[in-house]
């Protein structure tokens, strides 16, 4: 009888997971055709075209010289390039990319449900998962040529394997945690800081076996090592990207808003024009931006501290002065604002004795405070929305436990 009931329960959960995936995918497919991009643009076009036509990952060129790319993290460029090798027509190529992103997004919904089950009842977990599935920004992002959907997927996968590895640090879990960590580092440079934070948290609070921690670190290095080796061979520099200077300057110059400002003044343009046009170009240009950004902050710390706090507010809640023409559509700003408010309440109500929940809170705080040093674009919110939904679910759990059963 017990085995029969257990099997029935497992079957129901399997059907639920299949439903969540198919439902999420069906919701996203129309968005591809209604809101989806129709071509590669800007940096993605340059990177993919140079990979396709010249066999080099390069963002800019001077005549026949293609500058090795250090400005953009490589993973999403190679993701786009992967589909390019099938020689689809441009229209089909874009649709295949967007459809693949919709599949990843739908898988992230399934994994998100499993993560929620670690903290909440089944009903609350389903409710929170449906919110994540139907969140307008989450659906809209699938139709954009942007790394944000891949980032959201990998972050959810990272949390899943983080918790499963803490629970059972076998080689399978360790491998997938390391793989996900490495891919996130190759996708977003700032994830190096989050990875270090996660390792320290595992070591100090979760008391994981030292051997397992060392293996996680080593395997993560193995994942990123091909690109590290490429950079060392090209410019004798151990780095993934060199864009911290540009990002700091863009978010901290006299014309900067929450979204940053990339307008060059004459002095800065002259400095950039003097940079030698060689394989170190990206690195040296970034140094120019870094010096300029630090100088701006040093000369007017009060102004940029205020802007920093404004960016934090905009990241968690909404930007009250966005330049994006669609930002204030009710289907965008109302859910973002609401989930921002409820997530803060949820953090306040959270169980401070839960090492798992405390890790998510710490990760959230680190994400917001680090990214806000630079600039905040509307799509960046998708990286923290899974956490905000989990924190918001705490309110439902609190109501259930203190007022009535859900």
Language-model regions, residue ranges each:
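Transmembrane signal-anchor helices characteristic of membrane glycosylation enzymes that use polyprenol
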Residues: 12-39, 219-233
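Short helix- or helix-capping micro-motifs
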Residues: 21-27, 128-136, 160, 181-185
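Extracytosolic helix-loop segments that constitute the early lumenal/periplasmic catalytic or substrate-binding loops
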Residues: 29, 40-68, 75, 82-85, ...
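Membrane-embedded glycan-lipid processing machinery
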Residues: 32-34, 68-72, 83, 93-103, ...
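Transmembrane-helix signature of polytopic, membrane-embedded enzymes
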Residues: 95, 107-134, 152-153, 172, ...
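Transmembrane-helix motifs of polytopic, lipid-linked glycan transferases
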Residues: 99-119, 157, 161, 341-348
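Membrane-interface transmembrane helices that cradle and orient dolichyl/undecaprenyl
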Residues: 119-122, 158-176, 184, 202-208, ...
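Membrane-proximal stem/loop segments at transmembrane-domain junctions that anchor or position
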Residues: 235-311
């Amino acid at each position: 009888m017990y085995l029969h009931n257990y099997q029935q329960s497992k079957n129901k959960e399997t059907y639920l997971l299949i439903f969540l995936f198919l439902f999420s995918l069906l919701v996203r497919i129309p968005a591809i055709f209604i809101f989806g991009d129709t071509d590669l643009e800007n940096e993605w076009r340059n990177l993919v075209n140079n990979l396709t036509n010249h066999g080099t990952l390069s963002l800019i060129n001077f005549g026949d010289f293609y500058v090795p790319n250090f400005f953009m993290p490589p993973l999403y460029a190679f993701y786009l390039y992967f589909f390019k090798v099938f020689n689809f027509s441009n229209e089909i190529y874009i649709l295949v990319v967007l459809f693949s992103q919709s599949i990843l997004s739908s898988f992230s919904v399934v994994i998100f449900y499993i993560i929620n089950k670690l903290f909440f009842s089944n009903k609350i977990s389903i409710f929170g998962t449906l919110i994540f599935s139907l969140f307008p920004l989450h659906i809209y992002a699938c139709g954009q040529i942007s790394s944000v959907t891949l980032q959201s997927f990998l972050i959810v996968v990272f949390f899943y394997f983080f918790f499963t590895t803490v629970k059972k640090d076998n080689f399978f879990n360790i491998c997938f945690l390391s793989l996900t960590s490495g891919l996130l580092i190759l996708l977003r440079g700032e994830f190096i800081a989050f990875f270090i934070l996660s390792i320290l948290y595992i070591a100090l609070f979760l008391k994981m076996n030292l051997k397992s921690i060392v293996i996680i670190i080593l395997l993560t290095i193995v994942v990123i090592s091909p690109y590290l080796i490429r950079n060392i061979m090209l410019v004798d520099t151990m780095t993934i990207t060199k864009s911290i200077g540009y990002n700091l300057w863009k978010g901290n110059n006299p014309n900067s808003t929450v979204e940053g400002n990339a307008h060059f003044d004459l002095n800065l343009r002259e400095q950039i024009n003097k940079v030698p046009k060689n394989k170190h170009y990206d690195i040296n240009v970034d140094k120019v931006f870094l010096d300029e950004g630090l100088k701006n902050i040093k000369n007017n710390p009060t102004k940029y501290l205020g802007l920093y706090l404004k960016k934090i507010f905009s990241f968690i809640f909404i930007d009250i002065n966005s330049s994006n023409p669609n930002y204030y559509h009710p289907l965008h700003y109302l859910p973002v604002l609401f989930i921002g408010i409820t997530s803060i309440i949820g953090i306040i109500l959270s169980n401070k004795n839960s090492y798992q929940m405390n890790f998510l809170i710490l990760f959230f705080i680190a994400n917001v405070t680090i990214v806000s040093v630079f600039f905040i674009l509307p799509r960046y919110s998708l990286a923290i929305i899974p956490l905000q939904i989990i924190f918001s679910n705490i309110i439902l759990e609190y109501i259930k436990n203190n007022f009535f059963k859900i």
